[in-house]
């Protein structure tokens, strides 16, 4: 009973501490941007930003904001995860207690905020529950007894090759998505460097001094993951839009009457070079193919050795490796498509109700350019591995045949040489010995004659 009560207390502490640290940090930064003291308006704005980071947007008289700052969401989930691991609130009782407290705090924020919320009460609380649950599960599931029992069961019931195939499939999906996001970050940096003059012009137009510019730039970073995802879609051919006012692709970059928001100053121009457009469009295919080939041939992957087809005993494992790699590639392509759909959907939002009602990417089009190219790249990697092995087999067979034919042709010649060497090694008889052999021999008669 004491253990259960302890878990309830720990769960409540996790929820209270997480919200306190998170809300106080946001409130201090908001006050730093708006004034020296925490005011009623700052507190309400902080509460609205907390709800916004959980996916619940708000509206004012001048604009509507529903673009979830994904960097804040990631930090909030990480904070919940870290406190759960620190306090060791892993049990289901801790989760229930923490979730109740967390929902209570979010409901208090929802009722106290002076800004109009876009979502209904049940949807606000549902999104808050999802955020807390993700943070809790990321910390508790790996440490739970049921997960350890499940891992033990899979080790006993599931063959090692299948488990390895599933692990490689998930690892490939994570690796390829990480590379795509890194490329998106690099693209955003390139945009910022190339278009910094436009950002400076927007700062000057808004009348911001150096301090305000720094604080505004830092505040804009909370949407960095969103812009990274837009950059991935733009680079791979999907593009993105700022409502009805602007559309950006590799071929098109037009805008009209965009709001004077500094972050809009970094948005890209169309790429004029046909070569660079081709490179960008084929980048996901090349990345997936390269990662797939590494997974097939590296020892940490499927360790496929084409030269093993020379021996009948080692030929079977090579074919088995190809079969399992095909399964892993299918799993990776499916996971990447699902993850891309979810991430692109989360990155979208709105800044208004009319011309700025939709800001972000076309989810289906962006998922198609990413998922389709990735699947083609993984398929190309598997086919290249198959073709390589198929080429090695006839080459090895031909080399062995040539060796056999050379050995067969060399055997009679070798026998003739050995015979000649044998005859040459015999001692030669002298002329006297030969004459003695040919002289008549005198033998004594028996004395018997014919009558």
Predicted feature residues:
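Long, glycine/tryptophan/cysteine-rich extracytoplasmic
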Residues: 2-78, 111-114, 203-285, 345-427, ...
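Cytoplasmic membrane-interface segments at the C-terminal ends of transmembrane helices
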Residues: 1-9, 78-92, 135-170, 193, ...
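Hydrophobic faces of alpha-helical transmembrane segments in multi-pass integral membrane proteins
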Residues: 13-17, 21, 72, 76, ...
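Intrinsically disordered terminal tails
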Residues: 449-451
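Alpha-helical transmembrane segments and their helix-start/interface "positive-inside/aromatic belt" motifs
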Residues: 1-24, 83-95, 121-130, 163-181, ...
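Alpha-helical membrane-inserting segments
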Residues: 21-29, 80-84, 105-112, 134-142, ...
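Hydrophobic alpha-helical transmembrane segments of integral membrane proteins
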Residues: 87-127, 258-279, 295-351, 416, ...
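Membrane-interface helix-loop-helix junctions at boundaries between adjacent transmembrane segments
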Residues: 83-178, 185-214
């Amino acid at each position: 009973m004491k253990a259960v009560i302890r878990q309830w207390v720990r769960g409540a502490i996790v929820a209270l501490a997480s919200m306190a640290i998170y809300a106080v940090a946001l409130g201090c930064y908001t006050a730093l941007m708006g004034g020296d003291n925490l005011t009623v308006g700052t507190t309400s704005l902080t509460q609205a930003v907390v709800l916004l980071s959980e996916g619940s947007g708000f509206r004012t008289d001048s604009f509507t904001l529903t673009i979830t700052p994904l960097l804040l969401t990631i930090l909030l989930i990480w904070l919940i995860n870290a406190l759960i691991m620190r306090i060791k609130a892993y049990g289901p009782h801790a989760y229930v207690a923490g979730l109740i407290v967390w929902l209570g705090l979010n409901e208090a924020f929802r009722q106290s905020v002076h800004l109009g919320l876009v979502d209904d009460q049940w949807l606000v609380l549902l999104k808050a529950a999802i955020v807390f649950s993700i943070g809790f599960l990321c910390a508790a599931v790996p440490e739970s007894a049921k997960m350890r029992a499940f891992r033990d069961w899979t080790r006993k019931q599931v063959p090692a090759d299948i488990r390895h195939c599933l692990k490689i499939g998930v690892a490939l999906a994570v690796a390829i998505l990480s590379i795509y996001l890194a490329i998106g970050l690099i693209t955003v940096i390139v945009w910022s460097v190339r278009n910094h003059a436009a950002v400076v012009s927007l700062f000057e137009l808004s009348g911001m001094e150096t301090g305000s510019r720094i604080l505004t730039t830092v505040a804009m970073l909370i949407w960095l993951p969103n812009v990274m995802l837009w950059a991935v879609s733009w680079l791979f051919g999907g593009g993105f839009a700022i409502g009805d006012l602007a559309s950006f692709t590799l071929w098109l970059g037009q805008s009209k009457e965009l709001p004077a928001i500094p972050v809009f100053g970094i948005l890209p121009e169309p790429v004029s070079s046909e070569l660079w457009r081709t490179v960008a469009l084929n980048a996901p295919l090349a990345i997936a193919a390269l990662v797939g080939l590494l997974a097939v041939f590296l020892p940490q992957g499927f360790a496929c050795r084409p030269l093993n087809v020379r021996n009948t005993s080692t030929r079977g494992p090579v074919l088995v490796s190809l079969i399992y790699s095909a399964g892993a590639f299918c799993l990776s392509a499916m996971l990447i498509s699902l993850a891309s759909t979810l991430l692109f959907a989360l990155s979208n939002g709105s800044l208004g109700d009319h011309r700025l009602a939709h800001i972000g990417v076309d989810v289906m089009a962006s998922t198609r350019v990413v998922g389709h190219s990735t699947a083609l790249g993984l398929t190309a990697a598997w086919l290249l591995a198959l073709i390589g092995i198929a080429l090695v087999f006839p080459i090895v067979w031909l080399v062995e045949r040539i060796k056999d034919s050379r050995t067969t042709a060399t055997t009679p010649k070798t026998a003739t040489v050995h015979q000649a060497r044998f005859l040459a090694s015999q001692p030669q008889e002298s002329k006297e010995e030969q004459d003695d052999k040919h002289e008549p021999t005198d033998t004594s008669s028996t004395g018997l004659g014919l009558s």
